[in-house]
A protein has these predicted regions:
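Alpha-helical elements of the RecA-like P-loop NTPase motor core of helicases
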Residues: 17-18, 115, 157
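Glycine-rich beta-alpha loop elements in corrinoid/cobalamin-binding modules
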Residues: 1-96, 100-107
Length: 200
């Protein structure tokens, strides 16, 4: 529905870095057609090339899933299985006659990669668009919370963390966590305690 040229799914640091590296090298944006952890609307020629490589799954179309619960469930099963693999397959699903191609995710981040992401100078403040909306209960709950890792193998029915962050756990280094805790103590609203040290 979005008609986007390229979508990045999940936690996007690795695909964003790859996209930016290629653009910096002068690769035209319209040529970015096979980057891991992205989705594109593909031509039939591109779909044929993907199928020729053999590492793909054809999902039931969106339209079929709207009228067939079993087809929808089968698609979900494929997505769940592929999200629990080190080397997942490419997924192909048709929607309104167009092929949506979802490339496999990047490998789980290394400690150095996840540290580089978490060590950026975040403001720890809500987006400015919320400025005049009063308190944000969820923000108040996590304001002084520290993530020690990303990913979850659980797949609980009430939670989508594994869909966003993957089922493989990537852990931060002790030093990265300690640095964040020290930074928290300088926050003007810090009251002397950390509400949570844990997962996503």
């Amino acid at each position: 529905d979005s008609k986007a040229d390229l979508l990045i799914y999940g936690m996007g640091e690795q695909p964003i870095i790859e996209v930016l590296k290629l653009l910096k090298k002068g690769v035209p944006f319209h040529s970015l057609r096979n980057i891991r952890q992205t989705a594109i609307i593909a031509s039939e020629e591109e779909v044929a090339k993907i199928r020729a490589k053999g590492n793909f799954i054809d999902l039931s179309s969106h339209e079929v899933c709207l009228s067939d619960k079993k087809a929808f469930a089968a698609n979900f099963k494929h997505i769940e299985r592929e999200s629990n693999k080190i080397d997942a397959q490419t997924l192909i699903q048709y929607h309104q006659g167009k092929a949506i191609v979802i490339f496999p995710p990047f490998p789980t981040m290394t400690e150095a990669q996840i540290d580089a992401s978490f060590d950026l100078p975040y403001t720890r403040m809500p987006h400015p668009k919320y400025k005049n909306r009063g308190d944000i209960p969820a923000y108040e709950m996590i304001k002084f919370s520290v993530n020690m890792h990303r990913g979850c193998f659980g797949g609980c029915a009430f939670c989508t963390i594994s869909a966003h962050q993957g089922k493989f756990v990537a852990s931060r280094s002790k030093q990265s966590i300690v640095n964040e805790v020290k930074e928290l103590t300088n926050h003007p609203e810090f009251k002397g305690y950390i509400s949570d040290l844990g997962g996503p």
